[in-house]
């Protein structure tokens, strides 16, 4: 995307915030601006502020879910995994939504020992049916953990390094991720 297009998008959503007082579109405008900050500009602090404002402006169900998932991504990118866990737990108290549960499993995968993640995966599998669109993803994660973590000590160690590298990648710390895998 060109810088002109990016600037135009930011200006458009900013103008929506000014002109649409008390509109349901305010939450969506904050969400879109947060997306731009997170995905394009990689300004995680500003993205967090904008996404938090989206949550406070009474978003519809779809925007609320997308904002919840993106706030978790931003917290991961900022290295605030404990806060991401707490945030998702609070969201799950009011909304038992499978995608939020999956995001919670991802955060635990990045931060906890694989045994804890495997327990969460097994618990999630009890709630899902094979026709659920997330069933295969959960099964793949279970197989990945079983294959590489529960085998020999060398594979176990490599798997732990892989998880740490994945966490660094999500924080955009490419050098640390490469170092972890060497």
Regions found by a protein language model. Name each.
Residues 1-182:
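Acidic, polar-rich low-complexity tracts and alpha-helical solenoid repeat scaffolds
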